[in-house]
């Protein structure tokens, strides 16, 4: 699964929409309130790590680095 589909799956899993997520990102983290901006970043694969952390935050997730087993 690519990052675009993974993020969209989490949005759906949380019972929300891209519009609602973008609105919350705009209020909480000062993002542009434009759904096409987020959608384009996901399509192009240009979402920054800091943006991914903020996106996870508004969806109620933490990004955790875990060492793989050998």
Say what each PLM segment does:
Residues 49-64:
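DNA major-groove recognition helix of helix-turn-helix/homeodomain DNA-binding modules
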Residues 23, 27, 57:
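Alpha-helical residues within the helix-turn-helix
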Residues 1-24:
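A short, Lys/Arg-rich alpha-helix, primarily the initiator
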Residues 28-46:
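Recognition helix of helix-turn-helix/homeodomain-like DNA-binding domains
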Residues 66-70:
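Short amphipathic recognition helices of helix-turn-helix/homeodomain-type DNA-binding modules
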